[in-house]
């Protein structure tokens, strides 16, 4: 809080910071340490400064220093010089002359690395969410988000009705942590898996064959579509001559996993584009043909032509084109105001 207040106060009193060097010159080095500046850098606080980007701060600047180390040393030297001149016989009225060190110009961090840094240093994603590029897959191929899944697990686990169990649900998320540890008895291992989506998190504990079946997918920062269900737990009751198995709760199981990056090619069987009859003309047909030809794939393409006035619709299947539900095609359909359906 003290560091933030120090930055805000300096900006309020003396105006906006002109560049990264101006920031280092003006903000007291005793108030904002290296960790604080690093957090500001990777959360995007300096993105408006053209002379540096987030990738530059960790770059080797020579002599065992990073760019951030170089900037901190520069700021500290500048402020010590300013303080020395202020207390000198000359009264500090002269302008301080310094040579600003050159900064390496690097490509910006890729988005995944940038977002990982934001989460690591700030505790949240700021610029975007890593799952943003999979919104299509999540919208069309999941049955619930993770908070809803957690509620579903609690509800089913509390049931004593056998019919409530073993029903497949589809969830998606980013793997946030994977811990593999030996079992207490020393016989094999177990895995604690945590994933997150836009709204929350959930976790799994996997043993033996359940873990082995999906272990190849369980890597931090992997994007997964998971088919999951709640299996019943049983306990026995009654005496030794008349034992009865009763449901005593539930346990989460993973039926299968697919990489979100593969969903469009492997799971989109058909795309149906709804087309109102009154909008179909030569221009629309020409533009639609261009959009479809740029997104060739393996999914069947169909058109549902409907007449609102007479309440009639006819579906046509394209024999010439198969498509991939690419971002480019989806953006064009949205811009054209055409609704589409997947696997329906």
Q: Could you say what each language-model-derived stretch is?
A:
Residues 18-25, 224, 267-268, 302:
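Interdomain boundary/hinge elements
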């Amino acid at each position: 809080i003290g560091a933030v207040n120090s930055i805000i106060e300096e900006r309020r009193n003396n105006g906006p910071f002109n560049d990264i060097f101006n920031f280092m010159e003006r903000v007291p080095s005793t108030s904002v340490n290296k960790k604080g500046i690093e957090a500001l850098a990777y959360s995007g606080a300096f993105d408006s400064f053209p002379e540096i980007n987030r990738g530059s701060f960790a770059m080797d600047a020579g002599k065992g220093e990073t760019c951030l180390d170089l900037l901190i040393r520069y700021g500290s030297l500048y402020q010590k010089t300013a303080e020395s001149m202020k207390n000198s016989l000359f009264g500090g009225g002269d302008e301080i002359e310094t040579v600003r060190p050159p900064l390496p110009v690097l490509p910006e961090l890729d988005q995944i690395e940038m977002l990982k840094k934001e989460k690591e240093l700030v505790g949240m994603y700021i610029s975007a969410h890593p799952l943003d590029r999979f919104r299509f897959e999540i919208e069309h191929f999941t049955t619930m988000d993770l908070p809803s899944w957690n509620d579903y697990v609690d509800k089913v686990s509390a049931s004593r009705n056998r019919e409530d169990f073993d029903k497949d649900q589809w969830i998606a998320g980013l793997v946030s942590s994977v811990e593999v540890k030996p079992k207490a008895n020393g016989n094999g291992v177990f895995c604690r898996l945590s994933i997150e989506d836009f709204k929350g998190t959930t976790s799994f504990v996997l043993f033996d064959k359940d873990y082995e079946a999906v272990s190849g997918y369980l890597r931090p920062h992997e994007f997964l579509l998971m088919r999951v269900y709640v299996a019943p737990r049983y306990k026995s009751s009654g005496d030794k001559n008349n034992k009865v198995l009763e449901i005593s709760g539930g346990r989460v199981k993973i039926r299968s996993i697919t990489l979100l990056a593969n969903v469009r090619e492997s799971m989109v069987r058909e795309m149906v584009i709804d087309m109102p009859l009154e909008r179909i003309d030569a221009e629309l047909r020409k533009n639609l043909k261009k959009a479809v030809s740029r997104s060739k794939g393996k999914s069947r393409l169909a058109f549902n032509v409907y007449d609102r006035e007479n309440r009639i619709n006819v579906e046509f299947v394209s024999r010439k084109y198969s498509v991939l539900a690419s971002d480019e095609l989806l953006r064009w359909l949205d811009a054209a105001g055409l609704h589409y359906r997947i696997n329906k």
